[in-house]
């Protein structure tokens, strides 16, 4: 964890990836419950 200079820390990548994945899953379930996901 010492040489994070010039590179993005791993926990930031994990946090951003987790937020994106949760957001996509939330949008997918919201669309399917709204009837928009049935056409996909």
Swiss-Prot record:
One of its GO terms (biological process) is photosynthesis. InterPro entries: PSII_PsbJ, PSII_PsbJ_sf. It is found in: Plastid, Chloroplast thylakoid membrane. The chain crosses the membrane at residues 8-28. The keyword Nucleus does not apply. It is a single-pass membrane protein. GO terms for cellular component: chloroplast thylakoid membrane; photosystem II reaction center. Pfam families: PsbJ. The keyword Cytoplasm does not apply. Keywords: Chloroplast, Membrane, Photosynthesis, Photosystem II, Plastid, Reaction center, Thylakoid, Transmembrane, Transmembrane helix. Its main location: plastid. PANTHER family: PHOTOSYSTEM II REACTION CENTER PROTEIN J (PTHR34812:SF3). NCBIfam families: PRK02565.1. Belongs to the PsbJ family. One of the components of the core complex of photosystem II (PSII). PSII is a light-driven water:plastoquinone oxidoreductase that uses light energy to abstract electrons from H(2)O, generating O(2) and a proton gradient subsequently used for ATP formation. It consists of a core antenna complex that captures photons, and an electron transfer chain that converts photonic excitation into a charge separation. PSII is composed of 1 copy each of membrane proteins PsbA, PsbB, PsbC, PsbD, PsbE, PsbF, PsbH, PsbI, PsbJ, PsbK, PsbL, PsbM, PsbT, PsbX, PsbY, PsbZ, Psb30/Ycf12, at least 3 peripheral proteins of the oxygen-evolving complex and a large number of cofactors. It forms dimeric complexes. This is Photosystem II reaction center protein J. It comes from Morus indica (Mulberry).
């Amino acid at each position: 964890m010492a040489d994070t200079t010039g590179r993005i820390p791993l926990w930031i990548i994990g946090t951003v990836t987790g937020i994106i994945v949760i957001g996509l899953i939330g949008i997918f379930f919201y669309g399917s419950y709204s009837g928009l996901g049935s056409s996909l």
